[in-house]
Amino acid sequence: MTLVQHVVTIKSTYWVIPWELASYDNPNLFTAMILMSPLVNADAVSKLNLLAAKLMGTITLNAPVGKLCPESVSRDMDKVYKYQYDPLINHEKIKAGFASQVLKATNKVRKIISKINTPRLSYSREQTIRLAMF
């Protein structure tokens, strides 16, 4: 089974569970994880904005709430330029429902990430690549 087939199988079986939580609840489903891109830095957002995002995410699911800053995609300005002008990328604002679900999943993952025993390779812009084997 290829990785893509495995992900499709997991997503079709556990479609309501973010894959990070599926790994925690069902550690036998994954042999390893590669985590790319940092989690949303909730500390940089005011408590009022977080509350508003949660409220909007439950009341007005399709309300536009914010855009991804292209400079956060890469440090390489050539890649940022390509991202900005790629016609296949949706550059519209993020919907409140999606943002709310990402915040919920992020908070859950932050609480349990140290308890996940699956080997993982983590990479983020702020850190060097590190391999966590538990």
UniProtKB/Swiss-Prot annotation:
Disulfide cysteine pairs (residue numbers): none
InterPro entries: AB_hydrolase_fold (IPR029058), Hydrolase_4 (IPR022742)
The protein's name in its UniProt record: Protein K5
Family according to the record: Belongs to the poxviridae K5 protein family.
